[in-house]
Amino acid sequence: RCKGEPEFLLKSEDLVASILPEGSTPPDTLLISIVHDDYTVVAGGVQFCIQNEEYLTTAQGNAYLCLSPYQPLPRLAHDAEQPDVLVSAILNGRALGSATMSVVIDAARKITSSIKDVQVVVHHLLGHSPEQVADLIHATGSDACMLWLHDFFTLCPSHTLQRNGISFCGAPPLQSNSCGLCLYGDERRRHLARMHALFESVDINVLAPSQFAADFWQAH
């Protein structure tokens, strides 16, 4: 379902003021989490993991900023449609509102003067621009991030690797007949090129839920 434009957009000063309230002591660490939906509303395994991550982060006196696409998508955001992706921001479990990714990137750059340890963890890239996520990571003063393999979206827009949404395909080569016959085939070509560019531009530490998932992902 297509959502209308938000009535109000946060500015970088708004984000900075929320994370660093006047007169307060800055947290030692700010963890910025990239997710695909609102974990405070949607129930699921990924969302449960994010909830735990937020709890553990804030319990230690640190800050947790979660960014999800304002407009949910079944794929990556396309630059031609969304050159500056709109995201919904949640800070320590409290909704702040919506902002463009360029504003979030600017805020992250400003925050590093007060918070020395700003980290990015990617739970899901559905609806996001990987190019802007890379820019966000660089804005923290780091070239590294963590990325969870909750599924295989980094290998194909069909995150469960089901050809035409029916049968498991095993992430075959792009030139295969399987990709040529699949409704995700054309999108996968653009998708993989952008994923490769992300992994080239950022030092990504991959977190897998099992050895099987890690081995399968590395093999592809």
What residue spans do the PLM features occupy?
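Catalytic cores of nucleotide-sugar-dependent glycosyltransferases that transfer UDP/GDP/TDP-activated
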Residues: 1-220
